[in-house]
């Protein structure tokens, strides 16, 4: 049985690619046709890729792999946070800060600073500071929560990055590849499938398309982790 049906993908608009002049020829094998100057993605191939992505992701989760969801554009931001939280993954949904992976030691220190500030806020320690100092600390806390809040549970580098919009998140792609971190990527018609281990050709601009694909991947992670826990119990 298919992980995602053709009708679900059609309803979500997953078949709409970019304008034909903005395409990457490497995506040609996933393109069905062009209509009114827009490439149409072959959803039969997307369904096959989703079956593979689901199995791959489930097996990775079952073997204890750690996941990071990345998608910072407006259409994807809320969905990325929602689905990452649902499957216990870390996430970046506001802005990719240079060195998030390749300069992990520094990034980890910033995450610890965030946790310290949150403890200070909840204990009332910030409120006890002089007004100006408290305002500075709260601004720092707000900024760190915005950009690093989704990484608080990430104690080590991830094993897998799940990506929405490869071109927008090009820095994340470069850092992951430099560190040999696997990439599961939603690929629109302007992307390069050679830059990821697990390609999923689909519309990465429509909210419903992003919701559908990330939702299934989150399901796969939860299923894999449940299988891992069941194995340990036995």
Curated annotation (Swiss-Prot):
PROSITE patterns: RIBOSOMAL_S2_1. GO terms for cellular component: cytosolic small ribosomal subunit. GO terms for biological process: translation. GO terms for molecular function: structural constituent of ribosome. It comes from the Bacteria. Keywords: Ribonucleoprotein, Ribosomal protein. Belongs to the universal ribosomal protein uS2 family. This is Small ribosomal subunit protein uS2. It comes from Prochlorococcus marinus subsp. pastoris (strain CCMP1986 / NIES-2087 / MED4). The gene is rpsB.
């Amino acid at each position: 049985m298919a992980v995602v049906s053709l009708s679900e993908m059609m309803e979500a608009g997953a078949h709409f690619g970019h304008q034909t002049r903005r395409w990457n020829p490497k995506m040609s094998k996933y393109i069905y046709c062009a209509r009114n100057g827009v490439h149409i993605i072959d959803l039969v191939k997307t369904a096959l890729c989703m079956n593979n992505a689901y199995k791959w992701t489930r097996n990775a989760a079952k073997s204890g792999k750690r996941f990071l969801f990345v998608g910072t554009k407006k259409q994807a931001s809320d969905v990325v946070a929602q689905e990452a939280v649902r499957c216990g993954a870390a996430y970046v949904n506001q802005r990719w800060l240079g060195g998030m992976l390749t300069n992990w030691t520094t990034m980890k220190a910033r995450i610890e600073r965030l946790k310290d500030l949150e403890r200070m806020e909840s204990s009332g320690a910030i409120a006890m500071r002089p007004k100006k100092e408290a305002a500075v600390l709260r601004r720092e806390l707000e900024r760190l929560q915005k950009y690093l809040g989704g990484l608080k549970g990430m104690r080590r580098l991830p094993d897998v990055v799940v990506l929405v919009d490869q071109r927008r998140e090009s820095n994340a792609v470069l850092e992951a590849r430099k560190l040999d971190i696997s990439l599961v990527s939603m690929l629109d018609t302007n992307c390069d499938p050679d830059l990821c281990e697990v390609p999923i050709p689909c519309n990465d601009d429509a909210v419903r398309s992003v919701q559908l694909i990330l939702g299934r991947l989150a399901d796969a992670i939860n299923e894999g982790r449940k299988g891992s826990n069941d194995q340990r119990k036995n």
